[in-house]
């Protein structure tokens, strides 16, 4: 065999081998590909099935929010009809999505898309939050006296925190050391130490009972909705002081369909440059410049229904009002709307972004529109 033949033989064998087993680099690339999805839990507007039915609607963020599938869920009332969804959160450590309804907390495995367990808790359930390490859940009762601290793996109660405040909205800080607890019957925002699960501070008082709220990434400021205000207030999470009172200019208050307050929903864009505020009566999102204090009103976006919640994509490009529009943050234009299998409009106050590599969640957003700048400028 001459030199040319000896050189060609390995190449020929390689070509034959690739033809038999396939081109492996493509297979490895497909296995490691990360897909970005928006998980929309319904019924996420009270128990209204006309806004998407019952279950989890999964949308492909990179494919113009195309509906990919519907995942069945539990959360039924005693009469067998779907109960109001109250909150949603995700744990990377358990690879599970957690959903609260009026009566129960359910854990659904993201790989199998099956319910691992569903448990009822004394006093019901409201908007939960999961620790950054995915191991601990702060679970409010349904506007009752206490929060349950729950093991995310088993659903067992670790401790109860009594505040007598009408437990409602709950948010873990990004660094995992503190949880922020808002009750419907108090004008202050409570702070719990996650090492001891004890209340250590109250922020405020604000001008009325605290409704939805958000925080910045460095956990120094909170932005709160309060009853009776078309606008928001700002508090100092370190000192506990109320700092600013901001009202929407150019719009009047009026009757609202849900929640009983003019502004129910507030969020910071991930870069913390803007505050986005819900205005139910006027069916608007109002945008404020957060690079100055107090924030300055910039623009308003008209929506198809009354908004009651707002959060954002992890990359800071899109806003997700509960009315189901997808809004480009930079241009402030609506780029698409969420629809179900039949083309009907989908709306929900309980949505979360999940990045999946195969059947494993590798990165998650939050149902709250929280700031994601971790250091004070």
Where are the regions that the model predicts?
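Bacterial N-terminal signal peptides that target proteins for export
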Residues: 2-12
